[in-house]
Amino acid sequence: MIYGIGTDLVRTDRMEKSLASPAFLRRVFGEEERAFLLSLAPRKQPESAGANFAAKEAFLKACGTGIGGFALWEIQVLRKESGAPYYALTGQAADLLEENRLTAHLSLSHDGGLAQAFTVLERTGD
């Protein structure tokens, strides 16, 4: 059963400017996320960071909490070896999924200076 759906769109040029701020990186991205983003070629960082940021906002929308629901760094977006994105949650974000028996599904895309994320939260075990 679908618990929530969220989507978000980010202009990657805005993210390019934000990536220059270490405080922004720490406030928004978890440790593993930062390591992944900084391992990319500089020209790839804004689109991947934009997609990750959009994924965080899409997750919050799917939860129904809005931007203040959880610390953004609790909602990490990582990549499988295949390149497929997934959520790695900690803190209150992880608690919400566990307490409500939810699985998070995520799709990311970026092109033409835009990054988009789509999230579905599915209740399992019903």
Question: What is each stretch, according to the model?
Answer:
Residues 1-126:
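Core catalytic alpha/beta fold that binds nucleotide/phospho-ligands
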